[in-house]
């Protein structure tokens, strides 16, 4: 929706100041262009070349709100994704508010791992139940629904506000009839699925409490603490998932979580020590960081 126009001359003056604000505060100037692509009719190339001084610029947000929004990004470290109200994740446009964690690019690999590990699945197994525990924005649930067109995906979160966003994302991306939403803690709302689930995927809170204060201000000040705080050692939620998942997964069912740097060996050892898992694997992200751990329940 058009919210008015601004002259190229006025815009160019403000843009130069906004770039200097970014540089002075250690913010990538590309974030300014990203915001302006969402809030004006300017495209990436035009912004990169700064080829806008001699034209009128159409606005999708009011000129006052654009200026105020950028000040908020710089001064309050408020994430651009929250300002825009959306982010790109895999092939999806995901709505985000500060009720949900912003889906990270590295988390996209969690779906690649699922696809690789299940490329040889029979059609009957592909039609089974899949679960995204701690769904947040619903991004992983969308990835699972796209990967397994015949499956029913269950998205669980303890936050009603997060589930409302996840439901909206399912509708926006045409998966409203393929994903069921459940409010509660981890497996709690899925008692009716004991022994029936083909796979569980989760990006649980995994930051040790002592390290929360060291997170970037964009994260610790604005993203939900519930999605970050992993307890004293960061593995509080992961340990629950290890302990409880065999009750719900089928024999040979798939288990996959995202974790932080340095946690993979501990998670693998916890899986081994439980005696309930086989085929335990550690997977690296694109930066070669051990980011994911997968396993299967005993057959």
Swiss-Prot record:
Q: Among its keywords, does the record have S-adenosyl-L-methionine?
A: yes
Q: Name one GO biological process term.
A: methylation
The UniProt catalytic activity note for this protein reads: L-glutaminyl-[peptide chain release factor] + S-adenosyl-L-methionine = N(5)-methyl-L-glutaminyl-[peptide chain release factor] + S-adenosyl-L-homocysteine + H(+)
SUPFAM superfamilies linked to this entry = S-adenosyl-L-methionine-dependent methyltransferases
**Its job:** Methylates the class 1 translation termination release factors RF1/PrfA and RF2/PrfB on the glutamine residue of the universally conserved GGQ motif.
Protein family per UniProt:
Belongs to the protein N5-glutamine methyltransferase family. PrmC subfamily.
NCBIfam families in alphabetical order? hemK_fam, RF_mod_PrmC
Which protein is depicted?
Answer: Release factor glutamine methyltransferase
Q: Taxonomy-wise, where does this protein's organism fall, top ranks first?
A: Bacteria, Bacillati, Cyanobacteriota, Cyanophyceae, Synechococcales
